[in-house]
């Protein structure tokens, strides 16, 4: 075992232990409580996304009870798995040294470091995205179907976690077009076997939507602001890019831009670099394009940074070999990222206003539930109706005995709660 492998393992193991400890120090955020509700209503699909995250939460809560730790347990393990996948991919493409620094970047990047504790969709689908990227790199040199089928399975689980997992197929196709030796797979059953296997995972999605009137398509159109009149809003594009710089860390994002826009800055293996570009650009450009209408949320392009961070590690490792005077810039970038990540794990000492505190959404739900419970005792109200799905989910988790909570029925439905039995049905 090389020293780089050993130290990467130490970082991943220590990070996992710390995150398991830290996971109970924050209240649930709205998304986590919402997906926890899914796990209490098993189904083959849900309005927003596929069922994979609900499966993980169901197993976690079966092991550790209906608790914050039970919900977040697999988030921490999946994040560790993603780190392992990043190391294996970077080592296969470049070297142990680049792989080590790729793990370091992922561990200290705010988007990955903070997200590794929360049981969100991104934590799940990035795990499958990372290993699909690893198996496809092996598959491209194979004529046998086993690696192609495995890649299709991983893409399938990625899509059942978040539908944008399908964009990785576009990444693979783009690489195949760019890389002449890989073009042969377009004339053989290998590439299409991968597509077929991945497509089979969408069968439960289609069945569920057929039973419910295809609400997912309406939800996705609304979510992407595609139901609004088309506009070009430069400020929204700027907002998207600023958000990306914030969640990656400004200097690391600057380093990523240099790695992509200045190929001669540091020479790295052409084919391997092209593969990382193909992993990054399709997903990133999709959300950049959508931001001309409305800026996406900061985390939506997260999977693109699996390839992006490895490319940064490869380019800047080589750059330091030929330009040692840039070491100060690398140290500054690492320092800023570590500082930002550290602050994001505990912000109470900063006394930030609610709108500026990134952890504000992970506080207050327990107190709100206590006040609601007291109000129910005084008034005799039998159930709770919330105006937002995250509020309804959080109250369901934190109220005594974790009762069902409800929302006003909307048409078309834009969250899963309104598709379940309503308060009129359960409390006539």
Describe each model-derived feature in a short phrase.
Residues 18, 157, 169-273, 279-294:
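Transmembrane-lumen/periplasm boundary regions of multi-pass, lipid-linked membrane glycan transferases
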Residues 5, 86-108, 127:
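Transmembrane-helix signature of polytopic, membrane-embedded enzymes
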Residues 111, 117-125:
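Short acidic/glycine- and proline-prone juxtamembrane loop motifs at membrane-interface regions
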Residues 42, 254, 274-275, 284, ...:
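Hydrophobic/aromatic-rich transmembrane helices and adjacent perimembrane loops
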Residues 102-103, 147-163, 198-199, 238, ...:
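Membrane-interface alpha helices of multi-pass inner-membrane proteins
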Residues 91-97, 132-148:
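Membrane-interface transmembrane helices that cradle and orient dolichyl/undecaprenyl
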Residues 298, 323-380, 389-420:
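Membrane-proximal, lumen/periplasm-facing interface regions of secretory-pathway glyco-
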Residues 12, 102-110, 114, 155, ...:
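Short helix- or helix-capping micro-motifs
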